[in-house]
Curated annotation (Swiss-Prot):
PANTHER family: AUTOPHAGY PROTEIN 5
Protein name: Autophagy protein 5
Locations listed in the record: Preautophagosomal structure membrane
GO MF, one annotated term: Atg8-family ligase activity
Membrane topology: Peripheral membrane protein
GO cellular component terms attached to this protein's record: Atg12-Atg5-Atg16 complex; autophagosome; mitochondria-associated endoplasmic reticulum membrane contact site; phagophore; phagophore assembly site membrane
Length: 282
């Protein structure tokens, strides 16, 4: 694949988005907020606009521990929103149980499920919740984890200057691919990655496979099929798999036998993890 093609694919993945419908149950009515959100981003970044909109209905909303819910399940705001969509909502679309082009989630402001999702622990001087600070802390920790897997240590990210660290965060908030790439290339290995940071999710279960993968086997490069067959043998033991791997909402079964390192380089998320959602065939 030509470098120009890879650049184009990365740009399309970076700019991919979903339609989000946020519903607030208020008294005897349901109020809606409609927006688009980048897949390779975080739902928390939409909270300031969501809070501003719904504050007309709920007093002091910006000071409350807010959380999102989908079909009774609290949404883990620390994960990329595209991954959440594929993990929670995509199976319903593939099974024809839903046909809506937008993802409907509920905004909750009481009974925070802190045993299931990370609480927002920081507050601003005015007493409002500092959502951005919590998200920044989570993303930096994710980048440190992936950096360690890729390099064998976290030195590349820990060695970033203060200016570079600020630029990296701003590029994520602004969703600026060029600015993000210019800093992220200081984190990822210039030559060969020691291991590849991979996380595998299975809808309808709490199973999450966290697998630092060696990019090369004894004789040939490691493929995604190798990884899935090893960790999910009940789904991928046979040549004809009974499940489909989705990355960024794309059915990637055609990439099962491609080198995993190549797939990671193109499809990694902004925290440098490769997230794979495995959906059983219907």
């Amino acid at each position: 694949m030509a470098d120009s093609d890879i650049i184009e694919i990365k740009a399309k993945l970076w700019n991919g988005h979903i339609n989000l419908r946020v519903v607030l149950a208020y008294k005897d009515q349901k109020v809606e907020y409609l927006c688009t959100i980048y897949r390779n981003s975080y739902i928390t970044l939409k909270l300031p606009a969501i809070v501003e909109y719904f504050s007309a209905f709920v007093q002091g909303l910006s000071s409350k521990q807010l959380w999102f819910e989908y079909e009774g399940v609290p949404i883990k705001w620390n994960l990329p929103v595209g991954l959440l969509y594929d993990y929670l909502h995509l199976p319903s679309l593939l099974g024809n149980f839903e046909s809506s082009s937008s993802w409907t989630v509920y905004l909750r402001y009481d009974d925070y499920p802190s045993d299931y999702i990370i609480p927002f622990i920081y507050k601003k001087d005015d007493g409002t919740v500092d959502f951005d600070r919590s998200l920044k802390e989570v993303i930096v920790n994710q980048l440190k984890q992936s950096c360690f897997v890729l390099n064998g240590n976290s030195k590349p990210i820990m060695s970033l200057s203060e200016a570079n660290s600020i630029q990296l965060w701003v590029s994520i908030v602004d969703h600026n691919l060029s600015a993000y790439t210019s800093i992220n290339k200081k984190i990822v290995p210039k030559d060969k990655a020691q291991k590849i940071p991979v996380r595998i999710f299975i809808p309808g279960t709490t199973t999450i496979v966290q697998a630092p993968i060696y990019p090369y086997g004894e004789e040939e490069p490691t493929s995604m099929r190798d990884v899935l067959s090893l960790h999910l043998p009940h789904l991928f033991a046979e040549r004809e798999a009974i499940a489909l791997p989705y990355i960024h909402g794309i059915d990637t079964q055609s990439l099962l036998d491609e080198p995993l390192l190549k797939t990671w380089e193109i499809f990694k998320h902004l925290d440098n993890f490769l997230y794979v959602v495995v959906i059983p065939r219907v």
